[in-house]
């Protein structure tokens, strides 16, 4: 008689992971629940939300009659996620710690803990996503050391597991999973991948999981909670006062506490001005923030960017991109934004240029460009450089022309790319 398959499910104390564990139990698996504590702090009201979430996760395990474990990754989170978050802001970029957390904590630290310490056959999370494997195929996966050297042994090459969008397109979370390793993905089950949020809530209500059903959905960065973002950031970074300057006439409109506090597209809080102004560019040398009137100002729109070396879910770039050096696909740089048609151009160093079919609003360095082909999430790369804005192109500004023609730019930098922040 075959032993029960052991699935270790990450529990956050929310409804999605609770229902994921319930569904795994219903499928007849031996399920263990694990709560990860990644941040050690009180919010501004003196409440440690992690403790409450841990209690809720423990109660889920009691209701489902499954073992409960708690692990602390506070140190790993600080080193791999939060330090990166601060470093990116100091550089004037706009990081996405959720993507980095999934890569380093949930699908690395937790994955290895589940497999090595708890003897898991597979892990599971409450993410709305799917893979190209059925459950039984997941259980057949074993760790295979990546072939080394120039030539791969043809018998060691495996078909890559695909990361696919969830059935509920509005709740789809493949954006946040776009940096997950192939090794972890092929041993992961996403029980909610084919369900809608409403149906998940219905399942929770019918199975005595009311305590997680009534909780508000967590949004934003887990370590900030309900706190004011500017106040939070200034606890860790030194204020660097500078000016708000109009992109249209270089007029000084006000002052700010630090250019790193603002991201492109964000409304600038400038005292004394009736009309809203929006951040369109930042000067890292002088510490000035350039702003423009109107939310649809052409200075907010760009159609060209360059990424860091892309993390491909399949571990290799798509065959068409390798063959032709160019490929049509779609991308997004914010969760739930509409997919944007684009053309990728592959560079020798593994980075890509992304040319959007039409200019998009509020691109910012530090964000991740996540690529899609149909339902499949191909992977992602961090945005490191931006092309000129529509406003710059319209004006034909001399400084943009000088940046493009700078002898220090390598040919790899592409047309009109500059390291705008």
Swiss-Prot record:
Disulfide bonds join 101-222. Residues 171-173, 334-335 are annotated as: Interaction with tRNA. One of its GO terms (cellular component) is mitochondrion. Its EC number is 2.8.1.14. Residues 395-421 are annotated as: Disordered. Ubiquitous. Abundantly expressed in tissues with high metabolic rates including heart, liver, kidney, and brain. It comes from the Eukaryota. The record marks 127, 267, 367 as: Interaction with tRNA. Keywords: ATP-binding, Deafness, Disease variant, Disulfide bond, Mitochondrion, Non-syndromic deafness, Nucleotide-binding, RNA-binding, Transferase, tRNA processing, tRNA-binding. Changing residue 16 to A: Loss of activity. Residues 96-98 are annotated as: Interaction with target base in tRNA. During the reaction, ATP is used to activate the C2 atom of U34 by adenylation. After this, the persulfide sulfur on the catalytic cysteine is transferred to the C2 atom of the wobble base (U34) of mitochondrial tRNA(Lys), tRNA(Glu) and tRNA(Gln). The reaction probably involves hydrogen sulfide that is generated from the persulfide intermediate and that acts as a nucleophile towards the activated C2 atom on U34. Subsequently, a transient disulfide bond is formed between the two active site cysteine residues. This is Mitochondrial tRNA-specific 2-thiouridylase 1. The gene is TRMU.
């Amino acid at each position: 008689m075959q032993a029960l398959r052991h699935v270790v499910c990450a529990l956050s104390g929310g409804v999605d992971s609770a229902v994921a564990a319930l569904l795994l139990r219903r499928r007849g698996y031996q399920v263990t629940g694990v709560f990860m504590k990644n941040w050690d702090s009180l919010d501004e009201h003196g409440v440690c939300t992690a403790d409450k979430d841990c209690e809720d996760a423990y109660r889920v395990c009691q209701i489902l009659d499954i073992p409960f474990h708690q692990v602390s990754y506070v140190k790993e989170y600080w080193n791999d996620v939060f330090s990166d978050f601060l470093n990116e802001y100091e550089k004037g970029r706009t990081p996405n710690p959720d993507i980095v957390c999934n890569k380093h904590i949930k699908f690395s630290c937790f994955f290895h803990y589940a497999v090595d310490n708890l003897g898991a056959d597979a892990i599971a999370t409450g993410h709305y996503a799917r893979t190209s494997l059925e459950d039984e195929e997941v259980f057949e996966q074993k760790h295979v050391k990546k072939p080394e050297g120039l030539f791969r042994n043809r018998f060691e090459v495996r078909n890559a597991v695909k990361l696919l969008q969830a059935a509920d397109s509005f709740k789809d979370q493949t954006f946040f999973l776009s940096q997950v390793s192939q090794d972890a993905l092929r041993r992961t089950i996403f029980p909610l991948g084919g369900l809608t949020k409403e149906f998940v809530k219905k399942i929770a209500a019918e199975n005595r999981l009311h305590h997680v059903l009534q909780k508000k959905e967590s949004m934003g960065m887990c370590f900030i909670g309900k706190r004011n973002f500017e106040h939070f950031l200034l606890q860790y970074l030194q204020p660097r006062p500078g000016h708000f300057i109009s992109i249209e006439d270089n007029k000084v409109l006000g002052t700010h506490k630090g250019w790193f506090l603002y991201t492109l597209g964000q409304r600038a809080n400038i005292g004394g001005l009736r009309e809203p102004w929006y951040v369109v560019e930042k000067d890292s040398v002088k510490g000035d923030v350039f702003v423009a009137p109107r939310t649809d100002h052409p200075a907010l729109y760009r159609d060209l960017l360059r990424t860091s070396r892309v993390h491909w879910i399949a571990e290799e770039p798509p065959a068409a991109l390798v063959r032709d050096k160019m490929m049509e696909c779609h991308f997004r740089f914010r969760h739930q934004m509409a997919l944007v048609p684009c053309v990728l151009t592959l560079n020798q160093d593994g980075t890509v240029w992304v040319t959007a079919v039409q200019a998009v609003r509020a691109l910012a360095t530090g964000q991740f460009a996540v690529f899609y082909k149909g339902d499949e999430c191909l992977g992602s790369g961090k945005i490191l450089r931006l092309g000129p804005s529509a406003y710059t192109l319209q004006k034909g500004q001399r400084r943009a022309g000088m940046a493009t023609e700078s002898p220090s730019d390598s040919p790899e930098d592409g047309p009109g790319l500059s390291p705008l922040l």
